[in-house]
């Protein structure tokens, strides 16, 4: 568990006992988000009033700077808003088995310190658990390709449902999310299938915004030393210098490194948690979700408008194409396309 996950768990436990102060403490978890917003808006103000309004002499040059800077700022804020206000993808109710099946599974799973510990199961218990989990899938009319570290179908004892492929339980939120990437303390929410594209666009546009500020602000630093108005321009220059340093730091870390890191993840069609703990697929331990770089990027950014923070996804976050190393298993899982609201349940079948 990461350091910030421990903080989230502690706050969640505190809120369960102290409603009012716990609610206030929960709101305080947004401090990193507020710091980002303050820095971005303050940087925009300094850029417009000092860089463009004072140091840039050419009207045409100032207009170009203002248009490009404003565009990047608007796209950054739009992407952030979509990231924050898009509902986090939770596991659908159809993955929840009956109470009888749930009780049977828990009865054959060892418990330690009020937690179900699958790793402590005997071979006989594992066999019983897997049989019950198969019954759960039949009951829920779903098919999953992934298994856990002991070879069972994946089940969340805390949330009480079968885990769809690539779903994970977020220890920070205390709930399962579909195609879970990570819980980001910078925005105080989970990054999942539904908002991953917006999150990536936010760090991309914010990075370009910072780099644009830094590049076009160099002229102001040069003019300060050319003008030699050391006292009159000192206040502007100090604020200017502070913005330059903050922009340079955030442009490298976390923004710059995050772009490189997530580019590598998407190229392999992995999530952050899968990079540290790869998904295990039944029937072929070497199988993965890597369908080629273009298809991998399309699975995240959709059919078109990759650079626009609107929904263009071609996937539902529950079913994914699988690249099998063993070609005999290539068509093991075939998805049946059906609307969840149709008379027949949305499901997959095994050939």
From Swiss-Prot:
Q: Which organism is it from?
A: Caenorhabditis elegans
A Pfam family the protein falls into: DHHC
Keywords assigned by UniProt, alphabetized: Acyltransferase, Differentiation, Lipoprotein, Membrane, Palmitate, Spermatogenesis, Transferase, Transmembrane, Transmembrane helix
Q: Per the entry's comment, what about the domains?
A: The DHHC domain is required for palmitoyltransferase activity.
Q: What happens when the gene is disrupted?
A: Self-sterile phenotype which is slightly temperature sensitive. In hermaphrodites the temperature sensitivity is restricted to the larval stage 4 when spermatogenesis takes place. Premature disassembly of FB-MO before or while spermatids are budding from spermatocytes. FB remain in spermatocytes whereas MO localize to spermatids but often fail to fuse with plasma membrane. Resulting spermatids are usually smaller than normal and contain several or mislocalized nuclei. Fewer spermatozoa are generated and those that are have abnormally short pseudopods and are immotile.
Matches recorded under InterPro entries: Palmitoyltrfase_DHHC, PFA4/ZDH16/20/ERF2-like
Report, as the record phrases it, the tissue specificity of this protein: Expressed during spermatogenesis in budding and budded spermatids.
| The name this protein goes by in its record | Palmitoyltransferase spe-10
